[in-house]
Each structure stands twice: as structure tokens, then as C-alpha cells.
Amino acid sequence: MYVLTSPVGDYFKSGAKPLRLLLEEDGMRCAPHMGMIKSGGNYASALGPILRARKECDADQILFCPNGDVQETGAANFILIDGNEIITKALDSSFLHGITRDSILTLARDMGMTVTERNFTVDELIERAKKPGTEAALSGTAAVLTSVGTLI
């Protein structure tokens, strides 16, 4: 077995600074039944909306929420942390089943946190985000665990 390593920079240009996410209720990262397939086409389809969000809203990423259903960004899973509970979308074919996401949820359960995998809406996200102590993060191979500071 060989292990190859190479230095890389931060995935997001903001580095350790919390991200600004634009909530996008009209578009999707990819076709609904193709979300769990890790392919270049699925990432590429999100690039145009992400570039527009950066230019027009100074957003770091887009959180795709078709019809108000919170899903994922162009390259990472979304996690909401409300006190001792982690809420994230239930696994289905509309988004990528991230290994980093699974690892984080396993560690959270092992630490005694409540992990809730279910659909949740933009309205619920905004309502919970108003509560003191509520946090949000993106998880992914490149993103690792990156904090979200602002929802636009």
C-alpha cells in the first residue's frame, strides 16, 4: 500500500473565516436522481450559480434548497447544530452521501449528541438560526468541516 500526501490550501477563499451562504430555492445542484453520484457534471452544474452568487451577493457558496427543501452546497453537505442536536438532510438520491458527513455524524452520536437526519425547510433553518448558540457548517472531503457565519 502507498500513501501519497501533498500540501493543499484552504478549499474556501475565506480560510478559517465563517462562510457566507446564499440560500437558493429555485435551482438544484444536479438532477434529483443523480445527486448521489460523484461526477464532474454534478459539480459543474453548480459553478454558474456559485459564480453569480459570489459576484452579486459576495457569497462564498450557494446552499441549494429547491422548493424550500434544504439540501447541500455545490461541493459540501450542510449540517445545522442546535444545542445538542445535529440536523442534516436524510439520505436520498438528490444529494451526495458524503463520507465526511457520515464520519461527523458517527462522532457526534458517540459523543452523546442527538443526530436527526430528516428533511427540513428554509423557514425552519432561518427560525433556528435566530436562536443564540445555533451553528451551521459544511462538510466534505475538501471542505472538511467549515463553519457558516451568514445566511443570505
Model features per residue range: what roles?
Residues 2-152:
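Helix-start/capping segments and mature chain N-termini
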